[in-house]
Swiss-Prot record:
Cysteine-cysteine disulfides: none
Swiss-Prot/TrEMBL keywords: Aminoacyl-tRNA synthetase, ATP-binding, Cytoplasm, Ligase, Nucleotide-binding, Protein biosynthesis
Gene: hisS
Protein name from the UniProt record: Histidine--tRNA ligase
Main location: cytoplasm
CDD domains, per the entry: HisRS-like_core
A GO CC term attached to the entry: cytoplasm
């Protein structure tokens, strides 16, 4: 057994996997840029006080927490929204609104590793701060959808609104703790636990709330669900207001979706519209989640600022994609024999190709031609330029197609056409 192994819950990425990841990252960045979101990054670690500000001390067991040499308690970021909120307060509070930011970076959670769940993982997401208009929510939803369409992923999006159930809780005078307990059970899809909790609350408060909660949770479908639920909740003013807000948002979402009020989101800072996107592979893993969080900036002592955002679970996305486009092929340049003259010619050829944006590898081992060609095969390189003394004096090189075995002479002046 090797002495050193990678830490539990982390991964090494081989070159082929990194090519795939970079290709998908590039396509997603293209969509974020097309919406004129600006890329930022934040420190890998933040103060534990910041990371626990909303959820409290109980989040400690989910984080990598340590003390620095100044005895200050720090934690590796488990996600980016809190960091972006802090960054916004520090750097962007006087910037014209809305502020539109995106990021792609690694995050850390101390949890049991399993398929699609790691202790180090990557997120790509956006935050739109400063607008409470429905069109802002719609822009974020559309961005999330169009990113996944750009990479040809098969997915399903569920959209809901926390205000619908919150209005029911308010009508029955539930405390914040009781409402949060129900939300967490819904988020975990623990229906038995939910029934038990609702039964206990009904007994303690002498109310009948279970039927109304399950009525909300069970009604799913297209936009017509909103009008149906408005009829059922006509006595719940706050719930009706939330439904009308969701309807205004969906007016600007020209994509297929499922309305689902069973989306509770695990993070406590969401306040309105929420959505989740699932890959359609077996297991239907969530690959994206987001929503509106209008109180988070204020929680971190900034000026009240409405905000909406989402994050892709980049590793989950990679598990949902098979069909990767091949990036431009690399070219292998090899001299027929090792001589300073031929090596210098190879360097000139490589520079010309690299300056044109092509990926070029030189033979750095002084191999004989047959071994150099075997190396190219092993690396999956399809094009090899063979530089010989007589050919180069005539301004030519040999181009070998490693797939077909065909070889032909080409003029150096035409080198960029290969």
């Amino acid at each position: 057994m090797l002495m050193f192994q990678k830490p539990k819950g982390t991964r090494d990425f081989l070159p082929e996997e990194m090519k795939k990841r970079k290709n998908i990252e590039k396509k997603l960045r293209k969509v974020f840029d097309s919406y004129n979101f600006s890329e930022i990054n934040t420190p890998t670690f933040e103060s534990f006080e910041l990371l626990s500000k909303k959820t409290g001390e109980e989040i400690r067991k989910q984080l990598f927490v340590f003390k620095d040499h100044g005895d200050r308690e720090m934690g590796l970021r488990p996600e980016l929204t809190s960091s972006v909120a802090r960054f916004y307060i520090n750097e962007f509070k006087n910037t014209p609104k809305p502020v539109k930011l995106y990021y792609f970076t690694n995050c850390f959670r101390y949890e049991n590793p399993q398929a699609g769940r790691y202790r180090e993982f990557w997120q790509m997401g956006s935050e739109l701060i400063g607008s409470k208009k429905p069109i802002a929510d719609a822009e974020v939803i559309n961005l999330a959808i169009e990113g996944l369409k750009e990479i040809n992923m098969d997915f399903e999006i569920n959209i809901g609104h926390l205000g619908v159930l919150k209005g029911v809780f308010e009508k029955y005078d539930l405390s914040d703790d009781e409402g949060n307990e129900i939300r967490r059970l819904i988020d975990k899809e623990d229906m038995d636990g939910l029934k038990t909790a609702l039964s206990r609350i009904e007994s303690e408060k002498n109310i009948e709330i279970s039927e109304k909660v399950f009525e909300v949770l069970e009604l799913k479908g297209g936009r017509e669900v909103i009008s149906k639920l408005k009829e059922k909740l006509s006595e719940f003013e706050s719930s009706v207001t939330a439904l009308e807000n969701l309807d205004s948002i969906l007016e600007f979402v020209p994509h297929e979706y499922i309305i689902n009020f069973g989306i509770a989101r695990g993070l406590d800072y969401y306040t309105g519209m929420v959505f989740e996107i699932y890959g359609k592979r077996e297991g239907a893993r969530q690959v994206c989640g987001g929503g509106r969080y209008d109180n988070l900036i204020e929680l971190f002592e900034g000026e009240p600022s409405p905000a909406v955002g989402f994050a892709y679970g980049f590793d989950r996305i990679m598990l949902n994609i098979d069909d990767f486009e091949v990036e431009e092929e690399s070219i292998f340049v090899v001299p027929v024999k090792s001589s300073d003259m031929l090596l210098n010619e190879c360097l000139k050829i490589a520079k010309t190709l690299r300056d044109a944006g092509k990926a070029v590898e030189l033979d750095l081992m002084g191999r004989k031609l047959n071994k150099a060609l075997n190396y190219a095969n092993t690396k999956g390189i399809k094009k090899v330029l063979i530089v010989g003394e007589n050919d180069i004096l005539e301004g030519k090189v040999a181009l070998k197609n490693m797939e077909t075995g065909e070889q032909s002479l080409i003029e150096l002046k035409d080198i960029l056409t290969i």
